[in-house]
């Protein structure tokens, strides 16, 4: 009997509505406070369960990533090892999110793989345990697994649900790849922002502690920020390179997008406090 394809598992992008770096731990990781919100712009994954433990990935990406570095295959393998599952999967990735953009695409792909295969393999591993598996793959993976907008502390794994407004965003994608590792290793990165309560942070102006450093080193990011500020309050997400502006109405965001310089790319997407992945999981 041939297993059916399970289609259309979304791996949504996220925005860091603010990002504060509070210090550096002895293990090299950074303490931070950040506010994650999903947007309705996604990669998509399809899965076919196999009756052996083989894992195979197909992708529309032009750049080939080695299997041992690919977060999707690492996620599937981690789930197999954790559960002792004797099934495998053939996976198709429709990559739509930019790489190295601060939108969390790789982490989101890994999270969708864990959530989908947990369901398709019939493992029924609780979400909190699944998030622990995901944390070993990357600090941003748990928020995608939990599936709600969240205030995050620690290295990003301590999550508290929040429900900020869900506006429309214009996301500008500069033609540059920013290395998260290089930014966090840069001695010029601010690491002493005081910690504040969530209530205080929600009432204060939002900022990204990485933005000034990235803009200094990446003229493309600085140019995108300067252009977007003409139309809306704008910030960088994560360690960049993507920047976003907030709009009340979809048409306002689309009107700004229509004026985007030809040297830049961008898209319009709605904020979402519940991940599209959770809506897909509910269909199973």
UniProtKB/Swiss-Prot annotation:
Binding site for ATP: 98-108
InterPro entries xref list: GHMP_kinase_C_dom, GHMP_kinase_C_sf, GHMP_kinase_N_dom, IspE, Ribosomal_Su5_D2-typ_SF, Ribsml_uS5_D2-typ_fold_subgr
Keyword Ubl conjugation appears in the UniProt entry: no
A Gene Ontology molecular function term of the record: 4-(cytidine 5'-diphospho)-2-C-methyl-D-erythritol kinase activity
Lineage top rank: taxon: Bacteria
Annotated pathway: Isoprenoid biosynthesis; isopentenyl diphosphate biosynthesis via DXP pathway; isopentenyl diphosphate from 1-deoxy-D-xylulose 5-phosphate: step 3/6
Reaction equations catalysed: 4-CDP-2-C-methyl-D-erythritol + ATP = 4-CDP-2-C-methyl-D-erythritol 2-phosphate + ADP + H(+)
Active site: 14, 140
GO BP annotations, alphabetical order: isopentenyl diphosphate biosynthetic process, methylerythritol 4-phosphate pathway; terpenoid biosynthetic process
Cystine pairs: none
Keyword Magnesium: no
EC annotation from Swiss-Prot or TrEMBL: 2.7.1.148
This protein's UniProt keywords: ATP-binding, Isoprene biosynthesis, Kinase, Nucleotide-binding, Transferase
Protein family per UniProt: Belongs to the GHMP kinase family. IspE subfamily.
Functional summary from the UniProt entry: Catalyzes the phosphorylation of the position 2 hydroxy group of 4-diphosphocytidyl-2C-methyl-D-erythritol.
Name of this protein: 4-diphosphocytidyl-2-C-methyl-D-erythritol kinase
Organism: Shewanella piezotolerans (strain WP3 / JCM 13877)
Lineage: Bacteria, Pseudomonadati, Pseudomonadota, Gammaproteobacteria, Alteromonadales
Gene that produces this protein: ispE
């Amino acid at each position: 009997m041939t297993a059916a394809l399970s289609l259309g598992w979304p791996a949504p992008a996220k925005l860091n509505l603010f990002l504060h770096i509070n210090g550096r731990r002895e293990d090299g990781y950074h303490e931070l406070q950040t506010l994650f919100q999903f947007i309705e712009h996604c990669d998509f994954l399809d899965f076919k369960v196999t009756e052996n433990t083989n894992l195979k990935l197909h992708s529309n990406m032009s750049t080939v990533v080695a299997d041992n570095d690919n977060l999707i295959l690492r996620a599937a393998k981690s789930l197999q090892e954790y559960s002792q599952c004797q099934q495998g999967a053939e996976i198709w990735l429709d990559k739509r999110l930019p790489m190295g953009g601060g939108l969390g695409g790789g982490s989101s792909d890994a999270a969708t793989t864990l959530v989908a295969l947990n369901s398709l393999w019939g493992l029924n591993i609780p979400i909190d345990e699944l998030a622990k598996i995901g944390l070993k793959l990357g600090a941003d993976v748990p928020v995608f697994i939990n599936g709600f907008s969240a205030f995050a502390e620690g290295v990003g794994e301590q999550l508290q649900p929040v429900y900020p407004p869900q506006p429309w965003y214009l996301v500008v994608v500069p033609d540059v790849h920013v290395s998260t590792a290089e930014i966090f290793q840069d001695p010029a990165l601010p690491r002493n922002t005081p910690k504040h309560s969530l209530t205080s942070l929600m009432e204060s102006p939002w900022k990204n502690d990485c933005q000034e450093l990235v803009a200094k080193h990446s003229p493309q990011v600085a140019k995108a920020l300067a252009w977007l500020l003409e139309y809306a309050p704008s910030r960088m997400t994560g360690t960049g390179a993507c920047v976003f502006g907030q709009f009340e109405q979809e048409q306002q965001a689309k009107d700004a997008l229509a004026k985007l310089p030809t040297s830049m790319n961008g898209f319009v997407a709605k904020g979402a406090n519940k991940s599209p992945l959770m809506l897909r999981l509910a269909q199973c």
